[in-house]
Every structure is written in C-alpha cells, then in structure tokens.
From Swiss-Prot:
It is an enzyme of class 1 (oxidoreductase). The gene is frmA. One of its GO terms (cellular component) is cytosol. Its cofactor is Zn(2+). Keywords: Cytoplasm, Metal-binding, NAD, Oxidoreductase, Zinc. Homodimer. This is S-(hydroxymethyl)glutathione dehydrogenase. NCBIfam families: adh_III_F_hyde. One of its GO terms (biological process) is formaldehyde catabolic process. Has high formaldehyde dehydrogenase activity in the presence of glutathione and catalyzes the oxidation of normal alcohols in a reaction that is not GSH-dependent. In addition, hemithiolacetals other than those formed from GSH, including omega-thiol fatty acids, also are substrates. Also acts as a S-nitroso-glutathione reductase by catalyzing the NADH-dependent reduction of S-nitrosoglutathione. Its EC number is 1.1.1.284, 1.1.1.1, 1.1.1.-. It comes from Escherichia coli O6:H1 (strain CFT073 / ATCC 700928 / UPEC). GO terms for molecular function: alcohol dehydrogenase (NAD+) activity; S-(hydroxymethyl)glutathione dehydrogenase (NAD+) activity; S-(hydroxymethyl)glutathione dehydrogenase (NADP+) activity; S-nitrosoglutathione reductase (NADH) activity; zinc ion binding.
Length: 369
C-alpha cells in the first residue's frame, strides 16, 4: 500500500516528505495506521549521524499512537480496530530477559531492530523500488507502519492519541525512572539535569513519589515555569554561577542529593550528576544517550563512598503489560500530559518541529496525520 512518510535519506539532511510503499504484515507482525507521533530528541540524535546504530535511508519516529489495520499470521493479542502504542522496547514474555523478571530489556527482536529491519531480517518499506530501513521497531514518521506484535501495547480506545503518544517514549522514560529505577521515596531529595520532555517527566514523577526537594536544572530558564508546574521546588541555571553545578548542589546539602537524574546525554554532566549524589547512599540515574564513542569517567572513590551509578531505558517499564495502565492514569489525570505538547503540526511541517527542538522553543511537537 502507499503511505506518506518523512524519510531521512542521509544523516544531517532535512527529512523529505514522499510517498512510500508499505508491504503487508508477515507472520507475527501488525500493520498500523499512525494517528499521532511526537518528535523526540532521539530522532534528532539519529538524524545527526551520531547514533552508532543509525542506518540510512530510514523512516524515523518512535513515539506514536495509532489503530491496527491488519494483522499477520499468528497474531492474537491485537485485531483490526484496536488502538495501540508502538514500543521500541518490546516485551515477548518468553526470552531469558523477560523470564528473569529483573528487567524490561526484552531481546526478542533486538538484534534485527538495531539493524533497521523486521524480525525476519527484511524491511516492509520501499521508495521507488529501493528498500528503506525501519527505526527502533516503530517508524512512526509514516502514515502506515508495520510493527512486530511483541512491540505493541493495546490501549483504551477512548484515550486522546495526541497526548498518550508521548507515553511511547519521553514521559514514560522519565516517570518510570523515578518509580522503577531510582525508587524515590517520600521526603527524598531529587536533582534533575536537563528539562526536556524526559527531565520534566522526572520532575512530575518525583512529585508523584512525594519527594521533598525537587531541584530542576537547565541552562534555558524558559523551562522553569513548566518545571514548577510539574512540582519543582527549586530551579537552577548553571550559567548564573561562577562555580561547577556540583558545588552549587553541595551548598544546598553538603553531603549531596539523594537521587540525581541525567536527562541530556552529556558525559560531563553525567559525572557532575554522580558527584552531586549523597555520600553513603546517593544514586545517579543516566537516562540521556551520549554520542557514539563517548565514555564516562569519575574517581573510583565516588563509588567506594556509597554512591551508585545506574542506567534506565524506557523507565524500566514493561510496555505491553504496564503501559496500558499508564494510559489509564493519564486519562484519570494522575499523569499530566497536555503541558508537554507545546506545538502540533502536519507531517509536511516536520522539519520545523526539529528546528523548534534545536532552538529550545518546544518541549514536544506532535505530528497529526
């Protein structure tokens, strides 16, 4: 079938709006009509050429919502007409990782997904007879996409797709990191480095967890109003100080902050976040994705004296079983999604959405099909 899509033909170049061909779903696959998709920093990261798994030409997009159109052989968990959110972190329930109960990092389709292919090692997308790669198992920058069954969460059909599409990545990642990875407790102190969608979601999650002091940190003070709305008690612009941000935080509490979250992908900030964590028990959670080949460093004594360095992917959330409940929470108002959507646009305007992101003028732009 034909589908309008925003295709990245090469790194560092604007997306091109073209009509592509989408092949029918094969065994274990599902064809979806995407209704809405967020434009995420991860899409921009891959488009920049810095992503070690980036392949081109590719249909980007991984933060979407849509409706099932057709199912392939053997698909039983969804049917045509079901409302779904595609998952870049699949959940088969059968692999060693899923059976362990210790992680949300399923490996059922990970190997082929990282190569931009469907589980059988081929692609369902083509343009003028030439294959196009998939992206993170989702490719929501196409009006129609094909996704593995294990990479779909079935959701309440009454949910507002313009808002709940954000649960496909950024908001779930931030809120989940608070509850599942850090396990923030009432009264704990929290510092959030970077106030994009993920960082703001961490702030909201910290408020849900009844954290005591919630410190929001960003060099763009325009982010502070929304951070306070979500629950920040303090907002800090590192550029306002003539000393490292670590020292600013240690002035607040000389022993450090209970939980710090790096939501940028800057290895220097990752170190600062760890070294701002509380001596004896503080933990720092890395959420941001650093560029290809970059490494983190610190003095081992930082860990010897009780600090813990952790990472979090998709907030530790198991998408197929847990994401539908988060959609219900959003519908009840327990998760506030609307403020994240600062702009809505058509697919034809998608490059403007990337410009707004790079200029720091948006939190999330949602594309409506």
């Amino acid at each position: 079938m034909k589908s309008r899509a925003a295709v990245a033909f090469a790194p560092g170049k604007p997306l091109e709006i073209v009509e592509i061909d989408v092949a029918p779903p094969k065994k274990g696959e599902v064809l979806i009509k995407v209704t809405h998709t967020g434009v995420c920093h991860t899409d921009a990261f891959t488009l920049s050429g810095d992503d070690p798994e980036g392949v081109f030409p590719v249909v980007l997009g991984h933060e979407g919502a849509g409706v099932v159109v057709e199912v392939g052989e053997g698909v039983t968990s969804v049917k045509p007409g079901d409302h779904v959110i595609p998952l870049y972190t699949e959940x088969c329930g059968e692999c060693e990782f899923c059976r362990s109960g210790k992680t949300n990092l399923c490996v059922a389709v990970r190997e082929t997904q990282g190569k931009g292919l469907m589980p059988d090692g081929t692609t369902r997308f083509s343009y003028n007879g030439q294959p196009l790669y998939h992206y993170m198992g989702c490719s929501t920058f196409s009006e129609y996409t094909v996704v593995a069954e294990v990479s779909l969460a079935k959701i309440n059909p009454e949910a507002n797709h313009e808002h709940v599409c954000l649960l496909g990545c950024g908001v779930t990642t931030g809120i989940g990191a608070v509850h599942n990875t850090a396990k923030v407790q009432p009264g704990d102190s929290v510092a959030v480095f970077g106030l994009g969608a993920i960082g703001l979601a961490v702030v909201q999650g910290a408020r849900q967890a009844k954290a005591g002091r919630i410190i929001a940190i960003d060099t763009n003070p325009k982010k502070f109003e929304l951070a306070r709305r979500f629950g920040a008690t303090d907002c800090i612009n590192p550029n306002d100080y003539d000393k490292p941000i670590k020292d600013v935080l240690l002035d607040i509490n000389k022993w450090g902050i209970d939980h710090t979250f790096e939501c940028i992908g800057n290895v220097n900030v990752m170190r600062a976040a760890l070294e701002s964590a509380h001596r004896g028990w503080g933990q720092s959670v890395i959420i941001g994705v650093a560029g290809s080949g970059q490494e983190i460093s610190t003095r081992p004594f930082q860990l010897v004296t009780g600090r813990v360095w952790k990472g979090s992917a998709f907030g530790g959330v198991k998408g197929r079983s847990q994401l539908p409940g988060m959609v219900e929470d959003a519908m009840k108002g327990d998760i506030d999604l609307e403020p994240f959507v600062t702009h809505t646009m058509s697919l034809d305007e998608i490059n403007d959405a990337f410009d707004l992101m790079h200029e720091g003028k948006s939190i999330r732009t949602v594309i409506r099909y």
